[in-house]
Amino acid sequence: VGGISFIGSFTWGDDTPAFVFSDRLGPNSPKYIAECCSHESGHAVGLSHQSTYDNNCNLTETYCMGSGSGEVSWAPIMGNSYYRNMTSWNDGPTPYGCANTQDNLTIITSQNGFTYRTDDFTETLDAGTFALSNSFSIDGIITTNTDKDAFKYTATQDVSFHMDAVPFNVGANYIGANLDIKIMLYNGSNLIRTYDPAATMGVSIDTVLQAGTYYWVIDGTGNAYTTNYGSLGSYKLTGFNGPLPIHSVTLTGSTDRNRHALGWEIVADEPIRTQEIEISYDGIIFKPLSAFNSSTRAFSYLPLNTGMNFYRLKVTSVIDQVAYSNIIALKASG
């Protein structure tokens, strides 16, 4: 047993404790201790266990083990959440029947004399939106599953913009995090792009912004193994930008039989040190494909798959500033 608590003891008014035995958790594993603290706290504020049933309503797991593998694998806090990376409050069945569902968030915030904390950042896109500086480090929290946090950024000239959004966690690969982050980029009220990588809970952005005012909106999202119901919690935003010695990188492409022919043009004030074609199969997550010397301006490639291939060019100047081209999509013919 990793911990002990009484269901509903938070409201008894007599300081009844909940116990977590760290020497039995790992021993002393930060992930296991964090999960057990959350689990026993859940009992104290009125929650029962979360269970799993088959299609015929037969109980298969008294403690729901969750599902998935890797960084976005998921389990409910009130199940057995030790062995999945992402964990969260849940709205699902208890051991008392497949139709006996337990809305964790409603129970926690309506039966214990407290509710959600005050929102830290507004989601409105206007002059009052919190403004980012040219270099920033900000702590925020997605409080409810309808909460969004908006940040305004104004570029006075074309800039290379980098931002990392990291959910609060207790180890590598965001282990123990409760928040899977999605970021949306707006130009005024127009949604330009959504950053929601399928295989990771954090978001890393490298992009070029033309002069203008933009809004970055942070949201909790679901993934292949869970919904956005319990995708809540703290996060940190860090970022920086700077003027571009590389003014433009333009990538073009065509299909010749089954080969993809790529060509590009670079306009820059500084010499180019490295060039690298990157490939993606979803247009979001890119990986290196081939590197070239600074004078190369063309590349021919026979793709490994016959589906859609997305390409972009990553260019690094001699003063270590990075710029990316536009993204092009090509599909093998024939």
Predicted regions located by residue number:
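Active-site-proximal segment of zinc-dependent metalloprotease catalytic domains
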Residues: 1-55, 75
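C-terminal edge strands of extracellular/lumenal beta-sandwich accessory domains
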Residues: 96-132, 149-151, 175-190, 206-244
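Non-catalytic, beta-strand-enriched accessory regions in extracellular/secretory proteins
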Residues: 132-160, 202-204, 215
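Short, solvent-exposed loop/turn segments in extracellular or other extracytoplasmic domains
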Residues: 147, 197-204, 292-299
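Beta-strand-rich extracellular modules
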Residues: 166, 219-221, 314-318
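Short, compositionally biased serine/threonine- and acidic-rich segments at solvent-exposed termini, linkers
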Residues: 241-334
